[in-house]
């Protein structure tokens, strides 16, 4: 059995496998959140990919980082009225969204909807038919994190356990309700604000550190004691 240092070294030295999501027909890819037919890859570096979005309502740019196995982070710069009408269900995936600027409304089946504004955080299960994201001001800047629990490797799970991260508790946030919203909360918000102030030369390492911090904070977070709202679509 590998010790903690060997586990950490394997995870941190491994490079993102950008094709891992394409190895099976039913696998999930974070880019699907935006409607794959509307996406055009415009940049591809060692650690990230940039995509241009466009439909009749406007344009957008997203920057996607494969942070750890099963964990992605996306910077959203959207100037559109809506996107993602083709998202397929993904039973093992949780989507976390932080709104930096603007407003995002998520429309579900049966006309159920929830919204996030600046400073808000949302958790959404993708196990049902995908929702439509609408941007009433045609301007939205924020961060999306996807957790594909089926793709988080055993090595990664052991590292998270050593850091006292409880993945089961985090996944339960979106099991009871399809959409959970936490209104502006300082204990979480500072993590996302710092993700907008990263020196370019340490971007990838810094993102990894902040993702681990977020997972640890969410492990100890009590929704009942905070200003949370729910949509059961």
Q: What are these regions, as identified by a protein language model?
A:
Residues 90-111, 149:
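Glycine- and acidic-residue-biased ligand/ion/polar-headgroup-sensing regions
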Residues 1-90:
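N-terminal low-complexity or simple alpha-helical regulatory segments
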Residues 67, 78-83, 101-103, 148-152:
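Generic structural motif
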Residues 33-34, 45, 49, 100-104, ...:
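Short hydrophobic/aromatic-rich motifs at helix boundaries and adjacent loops
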Residues 107-232:
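Alpha-helical bundle regulatory/interaction domains
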Residues 75-77, 95-99, 141-148:
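Short hydrophobic beta-strand segments that form the core of ligand-binding sensory/regulatory domains
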